[in-house]
Amino acid sequence: MRTFNIATEKSHRINREITAPEIRLTGVEGEQLGIVKLFDALRLAEEKDVDLVEIAPTAQPPVCRLMDYGKFKYQEQKKAHEAKLKQKVIQVKEVKFRPGTDDGDYEVKLRNLKRFLDEGDRTKITLRFRGREMAHQEIGARMLDRLKTDLEEFGQVEQMPKMEGRQMVMMLAPKKRK
């Protein structure tokens, strides 16, 4: 049978874990109580039925605060969870064209590009040349210019069209919302 040691990340020392002989103490409401002996601070914490939490261990003397540690950890956890919910992962969506892409297909792909940019995703537009199409790169450049003007209100060009092997690539970033 295997046993695993799961190390829990503890960011703050509390109560008897604090080793400094003197500390700078902050009260429950955030008021400064000055520099006091550790023993006195622990006694005060016990009287008020709260924990003594080391906030800044590297300061001279270390800064400690009287607080309900369980409530403090819960608030921190809640803040981290809300921050995680608010962040949006920006993806790069790719739409591929060919120099001979017809108007109907062009409109469908344009609609998809608009949707991607509206959702806040960056888009990569790839125009692939095959065989003799390489001799007519100006057709591809015209198509990318047309895309650029059609998508002006949804996003701005992040990377101007450039050749990468047999492909012409252009990157668009969504416009910042006001």
UniProtKB/Swiss-Prot annotation:
GO cellular component terms, A-Z: cytosol; membrane
InterPro entries listed in its UniProt record: T_IF-3_C_sf (IPR036788), T_IF-3_N_sf (IPR036787), Translation_initiation_fac3_CS (IPR019813), Translation_initiation_fac_3 (IPR001288), Translation_initiation_fac_3_C (IPR019815), Translation_initiation_fac_3_N (IPR019814)
Main localization of the protein described in the UniProt heading: cytoplasm
Keyword annotations of the record: Cytoplasm, Initiation factor, Protein biosynthesis
Compartment(s) of residence: Cytoplasm
Assembly description: Monomer.
Function summary: IF-3 binds to the 30S ribosomal subunit and shifts the equilibrium between 70S ribosomes and their 50S and 30S subunits in favor of the free subunits, thus enhancing the availability of 30S subunits on which protein synthesis initiation begins.
Protein name: Translation initiation factor IF-3
Organism, as annotated: Ralstonia nicotianae (strain ATCC BAA-1114 / GMI1000) (Ralstonia solanacearum)
